[in-house]
Curated annotation (Swiss-Prot):
PROSITE patterns: SSRP
Protein known as: SsrA-binding protein
Keyword Cytoplasm: yes
InterPro entries: SmpB, SsrA-bd_prot, SsrA-bd_prot_CS
Subcellular location as annotated: Cytoplasm
Keywords: Cytoplasm, RNA-binding
Entry-linked HAMAP family: SmpB (MF_00023)
Family annotation (PANTHER family): SSRA-BINDING PROTEIN, TMRNA-BINDING COMPONENT OF TRANS-TRANSLATION TAGGING COMPLEX
Signal peptide: none
Molecular function GO labels: RNA binding
Organism: Roseiflexus castenholzii (strain DSM 13941 / HLO8)
Amino acid sequence: MARGNGIERVVADNRKARHDYFIEETYEAGVVLTGSEIKSIRAGQVNLRGGYVRIVNGEAWLYDVHIAPYEQSGKYFNHEPTRPRKLLLHRREISRIAGQVERQGYTLVPLRLYLRGSRAKVEIGLARGKKLYDKREDIARREARRTIDRALKERARH
């Protein structure tokens, strides 16, 4: 049995995606990486902002996710920071996601990258873009919740 198999450690979180999109569904996918990439991920040198997923020839690919070059490896053994990376999903999941992405206005975005045991996993979300007024509604809702919480906290003190 693999040690630490159930332990999950979040390495990178894409909070901007949750701000810019309505997340309809989420999927977990493995990522095909090189040795220097997994070492950089373990060091926490990942940026998911601006990343996206595309289905090409029945395979899911992760684009524009920046994994910094590993410091200790030489210049010949290092990787390209923003290269496309293949995602590991079941064939059924890929075909289902592809059907949903073909609908107008939907896209796939990486939400978080984490380590489960020794494996790197990425949580991708089927997302629909938010309009400016949707973002303003969310901000107003958060502000209202914050003022209510403040009032309740103040009331509990007295």
